[in-house]
């Protein structure tokens, strides 16, 4: 497996947070100059490949995989699509965690789920089931996420206190199942 592929995989998993050169260097046991050379090569590969929708973005010394600007219109159309398509299990787990733990950061969601939740969170934001609600007052000031009024409407409740009470250990598995059942009911109506 090439270092280039490893960097690409790490950037993919890092999602919107991206990674800094020193983080990549530490994870891959490479010198920072080697990481920079690999990042430059990866960026060039994306730019010359007309069949790739991805590009490498560097902001504030943080590298991220993002879609090329020419795909903005189709991505906008996707984000505006009605929620008649089912949410993935990852999105449902993420939504249930936010509903019960809000306000909560993406990293806190990741810690509960045990995997990166960037993609699921992006979908929930696009569907307007959750929204950003300020920043947590810790180093890095990460965004805090909460559910929206649309979430309440979608779930058929008026207040968050109408959500079923669950034990902490049951939160991810049981509550995501409740959301799955709710979306199944909606699809069958």
From Swiss-Prot:
What processes does the entry annotate via GO biological process terms? cell division; chromosome separation; DNA replication
InterPro entries named among the record's database cross-references: ScpB_csome_segregation, WH-like_DNA-bd_sf, WH_DNA-bd_sf
User: Where does it reside?
Assistant: Cytoplasm
What are its GO cellular component terms?
cytoplasm
What keywords does the record list, in alphabetical order? Cell cycle, Cell division, Chromosome partition, Cytoplasm
Q: Which domain of life is it from?
A: Bacteria
UniProt cross-references to NCBIfam families, sorted A to Z? SMC-Scp complex subunit ScpB
Q: What does this protein do?
A: Participates in chromosomal partition during cell division. May act via the formation of a condensin-like complex containing Smc and ScpA that pull DNA away from mid-cell into both cell halves.
Q: Subunit comment for this entry?
A: Homodimer. Homodimerization may be required to stabilize the binding of ScpA to the Smc head domains. Component of a cohesin-like complex composed of ScpA, ScpB and the Smc homodimer, in which ScpA and ScpB bind to the head domain of Smc. The presence of the three proteins is required for the association of the complex with DNA.
Q: What is this protein called?
A: Segregation and condensation protein B
């Amino acid at each position: 497996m090439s270092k280039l592929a490893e960097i690409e995989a790490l950037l993919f998993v890092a999602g919107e947070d991206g990674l800094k050169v020193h983080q990549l260097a530490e994870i891959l046991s490479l010198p920072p100059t080697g990481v920079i050379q690999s990042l430059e090569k990866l960026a060039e590969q994306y730019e010359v490949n007309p069949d790739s929708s991805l590009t490498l973005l560097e902001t504030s010394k943080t590298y991220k995989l993002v879609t090329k600007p020419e795909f903005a219109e189709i991505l906008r159309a996707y984000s505006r699509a009605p929620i008649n398509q089912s949410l993935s299990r990852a999105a449902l787990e993420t939504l249930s965690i936010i509903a019960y733990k809000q306000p909560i950061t993406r990293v806190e969601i990741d810690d509960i789920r045990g995997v990166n939740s960037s993609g699921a969170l992006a979908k929930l934001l696009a569907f307007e089931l959750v929204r950003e609600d300020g920043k947590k007052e810790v180093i890095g000031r990460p965004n805090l996420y909460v559910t929206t009024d649309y979430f309440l409407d979608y779930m058929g409740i008026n207040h968050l206190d109408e959500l079923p009470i669950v034990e902490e250990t049951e939160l991810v598995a049981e509550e995501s199942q409740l959301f799955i059942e709710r979306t199944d009911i909606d699809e069958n109506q």
